[in-house]
């Protein structure tokens, strides 16, 4: 018996359960109509909210920075991998988020795994929404702080946890997603911040799916609720609405400088290629100059969500461009996804462990770049397949 036979057994279990998902090959840029495995399909699974991933201005910025600085940085940030373009991007992000300073990480995931252990450790407590992203869960575990979970977006339960933990720890950190990636609902940040201030807790908001979507010019959920200056730490991504790659932390200068010294993913990873940093910088500039992109995103979101609901689909509590079509049964959710693809619509099926058992779904995301024709064609496919499978 080979030492790796258990891997084959686990894979076979996924296949027998109908949950094995091969990697699909994207053979075009991220566009509303993309080429996947040789076919043009309507793309409803991209995080490219504002349609910037294929914007010619980002590509030109990347080309010019590559010619000026080279293809790669060749070092970690703390040795000789901090280039002028990295500093320019971080200064722009700090201004954009209305904070003292910002620092860029290699991904949004590594932001959370790197920052949380710097804020809290043994003798401290993390108070986390039960539906927070996997990267937050990992960051909390790595911190070795005591983890307390409160029921999703339940402020009475959060108040209970805070009252029970008053005076029990050196420091406490309340962590929440700004927008929850599987359900598309928005965290009740005003109530969270008020409770945090009442109980003397730091606050931490992961704005991965809020950046470019909520707030003035896409500044995120904190700005959306008028809470600038009242949230300790904001984490954002450069790979979704910004359309490129990476994540960032925005907050007090003391935190940012401490992350230079103690943020392990930052310390031990080569910095972004200069072309990536330049494209991110250009995207932020476009977001400031073209607010109509966000207006189109929300027009498309409202239209698509309303039509799905009219057809009889369960879209849960979504308030954002993330619109789940909740099926429940895992196999049937995957069947819905597969049949939609046959009808020319790519919408990824999501099942356990990404979502709880009994909550399997097809997750859709519309973008600013979709046309009404794109959305109507996708809705027709949902109607046809939904009736075939007895979902509506």
Curated annotation (Swiss-Prot):
Alphabetized UniProt keyword annotations: Acyltransferase, Biotin biosynthesis, Pyridoxal phosphate, Transferase
Matches recorded under PROSITE patterns: AA_TRANSFER_CLASS_2 (PS00599)
Reactions the enzyme catalyzes: 6-carboxyhexanoyl-[ACP] + L-alanine + H(+) = (8S)-8-amino-7-oxononanoate + holo-[ACP] + CO2
GO molecular function, one term: pyridoxal phosphate binding
EC number: 2.3.1.47
Keyword Signal recorded: no
GO BP term, pick one: biotin biosynthetic process
Binding site for substrate: 21, 133, 354
Superkingdom of the organism of origin: Bacteria
Pathway linked to the protein: Cofactor biosynthesis; biotin biosynthesis
EC top class named in words: transferase
Keyword field contains Zinc: no
Location of N6-(pyridoxal phosphate)lysine modifications: 240
NCBIfam families, sorted: bioF, gly_Cac_T_rel, PRK06939.1
Family: Belongs to the class-II pyridoxal-phosphate-dependent aminotransferase family. BioF subfamily.
UniProt cross-references to PANTHER family, sorted A to Z: CLASS II AMINOTRANSFERASE/8-AMINO-7-OXONONANOATE SYNTHASE, LD36009P
Protein's recorded name: 8-amino-7-oxononanoate synthase
Upper lineage: Bacteria, Bacillati, Bacillota, Clostridia, Eubacteriales
């Amino acid at each position: 018996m080979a030492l790796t036979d258990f891997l084959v057994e686990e894979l076979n279990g996924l296949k027998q359960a109908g949950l094995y998902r091969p990697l699909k090959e994207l053979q075009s840029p991220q566009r509303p109509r993309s080429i996947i495995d040789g076919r043009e399909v309507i793309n409803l699974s991209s995080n490219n909210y504002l349609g910037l991933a294929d914007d010619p201005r980002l590509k030109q910025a990347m080309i010019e920075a590559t010619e000026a600085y080279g293809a790669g940085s060749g070092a970690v940030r703390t040795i000789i991998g901090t280039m002028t373009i990295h500093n320019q991007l971080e200064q722009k992000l700090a201004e954009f988020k209305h904070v003292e300073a910002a620092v860029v990480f290699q991904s949004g995931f590594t932001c959370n795994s790197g920052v949380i252990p710097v804020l809290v450790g043994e003798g401290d407590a993390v108070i986390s929404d039960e539906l927070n992203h996997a990267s937050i869960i990992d960051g909390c575990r790595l911190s070795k702080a005591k983890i307390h979970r409160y029921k999703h977006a339940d402020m009475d339960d959060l108040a209970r946890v805070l009252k029970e933990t008053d005076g029990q720890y050196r420091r406490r950190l309340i962590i929440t997603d700004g927008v929850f990636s599987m359900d598309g609902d928005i965290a009740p940040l005003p109530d969270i911040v008020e409770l945090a201030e009442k109980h003397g807790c730091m606050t931490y908001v992961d704005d991965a799916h809020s950046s470019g979507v909520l707030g003035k010019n896409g500044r995120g959920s904190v700005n959306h609720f008028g809470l600038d200056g009242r949230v300790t730490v904001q984490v954002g991504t450069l790979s979704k609405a910004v359309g490129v790659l990476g994540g960032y932390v925005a907050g007090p200068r003391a935190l940012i400088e401490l992350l230079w010294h103690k943020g392990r993913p930052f310390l031990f990873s080569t910095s972004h290629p200069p072309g990536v940093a330049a494209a991110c910088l250009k995207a932020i500039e476009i977001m400031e100059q073209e607010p109509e992109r966000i207006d189109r995103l929300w027009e498309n979101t409202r239209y698509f969500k309303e039509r799905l609901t009219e057809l009889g689909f369960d879209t849960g509590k979504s308030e954002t461009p993330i619109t789940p079509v909740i099926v429940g049964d895992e196999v049937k959710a995957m069947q819905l996804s597969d049949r939609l693809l046959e009808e020319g619509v790519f919408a990824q099926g999501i099942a356990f462990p990404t979502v709880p058992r009994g909550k399997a779904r097809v997750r859709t995301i519309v973008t600013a770049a979709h046309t009404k024709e794109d959305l109507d064609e996708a809705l027709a496919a949902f109607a046809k397949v939904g009736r075939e499978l007895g979902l509506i």
